[in-house]
């Protein structure tokens, strides 16, 4: 077994040849490299599959032996300082390696079809393979220096992938926003690393934890400085995992291709922050203020992400805010010390969210044949609806991911989220109330996304593009400004946007694309006729990864269920994490009280079903046909209560649609303040600093010109003036010093 561990250092480097060979091929033999581009995709999948098999084998060995393995190479610079490079294989490493490889393989297979007609196909696969290399290097690092190096490489890859379509100004701005926001956290991470090295004299995790715990036990450290260093370390995780207040880059990151969104939100970039906090938890747990800060940031992010998802019209942005909220649950669990629950939710959420993003990509792909190749249109849920008849496989798998994220048993996220909710009662009742309420919000906004996308009729066929008439045919409201601001019935859609899809603009479909015959029909609507096509199901290359992730969503939660209660009541996950849990808690109780579990499960599932019911009441098409019934009319009647209710709804909508005004606050005060400071600095430099320098020159020029006109050109006059000035100077000097 030890021989197997000795070769674990190769894990990050196995996918690396693909980006290197693609880059060299495009530089030296561009035509030949592009002609064999499918071969590069196959190699990317093959190499990552090798890493996956190796990671699974290491995980099985760890489950059976419950051991760590660390290997270090030392580069001695002098007698007082040396750089150590190595790798650490422990339960956290093996979990993250399996997540990265399994999700990464599914995304690569999916991308082969999704990016088939993109000119940047090879560049995309080069970035993806390098992204996997960077993340695998991060999770296998044995010290903080390696962590920081691969941390920056992960940030670089995310910058390249978010701005993959860099010719679009929106995508270029999004990748810059992500890069700059993460620079704030990365700078804090670097300062924190240097601070703890100054305290302990080591970058290695095992030595760092041992030395620091001894210093704390003997009260030999400055707690204020230690707390500051810990906060700086945590700032890196806050930025990378999109936690409040450095979350603003996450929704804009949706400007990249959809497979990138799946990888970033499931197993790579946003998971890196959770991984860092989990890795450094032995360091943080002896600093109570930091643990409380982690839990506070987590619970704020949980609620904020859920509220911001309520009014999103873009399907990918809605899922992005959902990711933000679920990451908040993980951070809350880590802050409470629930190490196992946090990693369990990291696993279950990764597969569920990858399923949802790839499913949304399939939906977007199908909508592009109708509304054109524009993200603002193909991702707009207001133009969707009724897709269950056209994309049934995507509908079923998307529903699985939605139910899992809502916490409906027996799907994956039910088991992990329920543990976090139960632990929150023991930690803080206030945090528990917020966490449980947010579980209901999660069910509401996730089913809102599902219903707007799949239920009812296809909205793109019934849009009133002229904006002169109301369109009551299809009455699911998107809860947008057009519906809410005018105090119209919540279940009626008004279209006042002057957007033309079929009347004025034609969107040709690539002839080299899918050669599929689709039914066309002519729909007469408000005295105008147009020819419409319907969405279609994606190809098998895209459906296969979605199907596999659906299976993961169904069954991955079983690793945390204690089936065998004899002799310790350990489930697979607890046995897997036993070395890490024992390191954190010497006397860990892994037993499960099934009665308590059932009570809490009934409550959490009831809250989830309540959120689903509210979403169904507001967005399911069956209620749109009840517009004349007394129940619906009671909501529409005007009156003081109705006006107050409209104000509340408008306020919630504005809060959610405007991203809680946090972006506006940063733009006005932070960006505006920096620009104001820059303008003041520019003014001071040009007017004051340069003014003093230029002023001396101007004065010298004026004095010189004045003297030039005084002089008459006679040397005798110059000598007379010179002697006169010297005589006056000597006289003054004599008078001053003779009196002393």
From Swiss-Prot:
Q: Which GO terms describe its cellular component?
A: chloroplast thylakoid membrane
Q: Which InterPro entries match?
A: NADH_UbQ_OxRdtase_chlpt_su5_C (IPR002128), NADHpl_OxRdtase_5_subgr (IPR018393), ND/Mrp_TM (IPR001750), NU5C-like (IPR003945), Proton_antipo_N (IPR001516)
What Enzyme Commission number(s) does the record list for this chain?
Answer: 7.1.1.-
An individual GO BP term: electron transport coupled proton transport
Checking Pfam families in the record gives:
Proton_antipo_C, Proton_antipo_M, Proton_antipo_N
Q: Which reaction does it catalyse?
A: a plastoquinone + NADH + (n+1) H(+)(in) = a plastoquinol + NAD(+) + n H(+)(out); a plastoquinone + NADPH + (n+1) H(+)(in) = a plastoquinol + NADP(+) + n H(+)(out)
Function field: NDH shuttles electrons from NAD(P)H:plastoquinone, via FMN and iron-sulfur (Fe-S) centers, to quinones in the photosynthetic chain and possibly in a chloroplast respiratory chain. The immediate electron acceptor for the enzyme in this species is believed to be plastoquinone. Couples the redox reaction to proton translocation, and thus conserves the redox energy in a proton gradient.
Q: How does it assemble?
A: NDH is composed of at least 16 different subunits, 5 of which are encoded in the nucleus.
The UniProt entry, under NCBIfam families, shows: NDH_I_L, PRK06590.1
- Identify its protein family: Belongs to the complex I subunit 5 family.
Q: What is this protein called?
A: NAD(P)H-quinone oxidoreductase subunit 5, chloroplastic
